[in-house]
Regions:
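N-terminal Rossmann-like FAD-binding beta1-loop-alpha1 element of flavoenzymes
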Residues: 6-33, 189-198
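Rossmann-like NAD(P)H-binding beta-loop-alpha module
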Residues: 174-206
Length: 206
């Protein structure tokens, strides 16, 4: 393929990074993947799509128990054990991360993972501050930045003085709050708002 013999560095280890790594290897390249977090997989499997869909589905079932539309089937208020729900959610996330990401590294000798923070020295050289406290330099023919996303905090006066959640903290909270205020109305905001409402919180969207 067109990538035969190329040394490729990919900064990040999410779905985009792995898709690029597999394609590069398919074309004959050798890939070094750099990830500064202690776990691989990026946003979707760890703190995004996967845990959110698990929580949304659980909340939907709670809602159906309370408000299903069929006469002759008794409706009842669900008993929510958030910690047990969360333990199952985390276990499923771990399972999918192993299946979709960790197993690829284990089965592919042409993809190497380095855990540390990357910085550019020049167009073809990456310096890596390794998580173990050491450092190394990597030279590459191609470098892909696939560092993904992180929650953005709005510039709201007084926000730093209150125990706010970002989307990740909302997905992994151990308790259902009595009242949740959601600032914003994006898809993520409304999904979280609906889930918490169905699990028993009073929810206000601003």
């Amino acid at each position: 393929g067109g990538g035969t013999g190329l040394q490729v560095v990919i900064i990040g280890s999410g779905s985009g990074a792995f898709a690029a790594a597999l394609k590069a290897v398919e074309e004959g390249a050798t890939v070094t993947m750099i990830e500064r977090q202690p776990i691989i997989g990026g946003t979707c499997v760890n703190v995004g799509c996967v845990p959110s869909k698990i929580m949304i589905r659980a909340a939907q079932l709670a809602h159906h128990q309370r408000a299903q539309p069929f006469d002759g089937i008794e409706r009842s208020e669900p008993i929510i054990d958030r910690r047990t729900m969360l333990a199952q959610q985390i276990a499923r996330v771990d399972e999918l991360r192993e299946a979709k990401y960790e197993s690829i590294l284990a089965d592919n000798d042409n993809i190497t993972l380095i855990q540390g923070s990357a910085s550019f020295e020049d167009a073809h050289t990456i310096a890596v501050a390794l998580n173990d406290g050491t450092s190394k330099k990597i030279t590459a023919d191609r470098i892909l930045i696939a560092t993904g996303s992180t929650p953005a905090l709005p510039n709201v006066e007084g926000l730093a003085d209150v125990p706010y959640w970002n989307s990740t903290e909302a997905l992994f909270a151990e308790k259902i709050p009595e009242h949740l205020v959601v600032i914003g109305s994006s898809v993520v905001a409304v999904e979280i708002a609906q889930a918490y409402s169905r699990l028993g919180s009073a929810v206000t969207i601003l």
